[in-house]
Regions:
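Residues that mark the start of a beta-strand
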Residues: 171-175, 195, 243, 286, ...
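Cysteine-nucleophile active-site neighborhood
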Residues: 215, 220-286, 294, 339-353
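A glycine-centered loop/beta-turn motif at secondary-structure junctions
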Residues: 319-356
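RNA-binding accessory domains that recognize and position tRNA/RNA substrates
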Residues: 1-206, 210-211, 225, 337, ...
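Glycine-rich phosphate/pyrophosphate-binding beta-alpha loops
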Residues: 34, 290-295, 331-339
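Beta-strand-turn-beta hairpins that frame and shape the catalytic cleft
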Residues: 168-174, 281-284, 322-327
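Proline-centered loop/turn at the N-terminus of a beta-strand
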Residues: 106, 173, 243-245, 261, ...
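Catalytic beta-strand/loop cores that center a nucleophilic Ser/Cys/Thr
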Residues: 283-325
Length: 357
């Protein structure tokens, strides 16, 4: 069935609906990653959003359980060019069509995603709806008027504490606050030789410190960091008690905890090819990113935080370090999935802080 994506500024893009009855509303964003569509669909950082893939052919290698980054897809919709109906890969367990259908993800395909992307780049990310061609105007208007949820972290965090053990002797114990963490991040930390206790996002500082971890990890996640002031308050209580490493949303929350400010970007950074300059090393690394908010560099004046990394494309803040405490953060995902692994050295830095080096 024919369908369309209608943005809040009135622009409209036609395509085919995978499920003719599907309709949805969300913030329309795009990612430039060429592969890793299943990882993107199941990345909790995309919660509440309609995801547009810029690469023209999606689904050609199918899907598999091993590529899941969370318990289910959290996107509100999926907009793509060509949808492959005959995947071919030795790891494939089911087609992308079956995956989207079984998980009830509204998908609009055969869309001019280049046009969608160019419009978002020019006008900025905005609210949009996916509907079938026959949808009544009143129904479209009601969908467009729907208020999107704000505390997205509460929707994606783990409901209970769980532990990832390791066989390595003298392994550090890391308390990971789950704001929407990707499975690959935890698996990489665990594989490096760490016991991880994964905690719900709203765990109190007292409960975290009662575990006596060697370090605290603040994960990635969706939404506006200013929508979760309770978490910021708990981070303030933990500062100086244990080494802390934050990524993505965790990076933004750390900045807020020390008095800096964040702002909404025009269209964000989403993809596996963002160049980041490490100012201390004077080297550029390619990073995987998924965020629509950033730390305001002007607001760092008077705080104990210094900029350690910047984005080569737009000079936005990509990394921070505390001047006296064992605390640092980056705006991107060090382990990628999908994307490059140029930045795995950051975990080595975290290990060094936990050892007091």
């Amino acid at each position: 069935m024919r369908g369309k994506l209608i943005l809040e500024d009135g622009s409209s893009y036609t395509g085919e609906l995978l499920d003719g009855n599907a309709k949805t509303v969300g913030e329309v964003v795009f990612t430039t990653t060429m592969t890793g569509y299943q990882e993107s669909l199941t990345d909790p950082s995309f919660c509440g959003q309609i995801l547009t893939m810029t690469y023209p052919l999606i689904g050609n290698y199918g899907t598999a359980a091993k590529f899941m980054q969370s318990r289910r897809p959290f996107v509100r919709g999926f907009v793509i060019g060509e949808l492959c109906d005959a995947p071919n890969n030795w790891q494939s367990e089911k087609s992308l069509i079956d995956f989207l259908t079984q998980n009830k993800v509204p998908c609009l395909y055969n869309v001019d995603t280049r046009a969608v992307t160019r419009h978002i780049r020019a006008a900025g990310s905005m609210k949009g709806v996916i509907v079938s061609d026959g949808t009544e105007p009143d129904e479209i208007a009601a969908l467009q008027a729907e208020e999107l949820p704000r505390d997205l972290v509460a929707m994606v965090t783990t409901p209970e504490v769980y532990v990832m053990e390791t066989d390595q002797e003298d392994a550090p114990h890391i308390a990971a606050l789950d704001f929407g963490v990707k499975r690959s991040i935890l698996e990489n930390i665990n594989r490096l030789g760490a016991k991880i206790t994964v905690l719900p996002a709203y765990t109190s500082a007292e409960e975290v410190l009662a575990l006596n971890p060697d370090g605290i990890f603040l994960s990635n996640g969706p939404g506006d960091p200013q929508d979760v002031p309770e978490i910021v308050a708990e981070i303030q209580k933990m500062a100086g008690k244990k080494p802390i490493f934050g990524i993505c949303l965790g990076h933004q929350l750390l900045a807020l905890a020390f008095g800096a400010k964040t702002y909404k970007m025009k269209f964000g950074h989403r993809g596996g090819n963002q160049p980041v300059k490490n100012l201390r090393m004077n080297r550029v690394h390619i990073s995987a990113q998924n965020h629509g908010y950033a730390v305001d560099p002007a607001s760092l004046e008077g705080t104990p935080l210094v900029i350690t990394h910047t984005n080569v494309n737009d000079d936005t803040v990509e990394g921070l370090r505390h001047t006296s405490l064992p605390i640092f953060s980056v705006q991107y995902h060090p382990e990628a999935a999908p994307g490059p692994d140029d930045n795995m050295y950051l975990f080595d830095e975290f290990w060094a802080l936990m050892k007091g080096e």
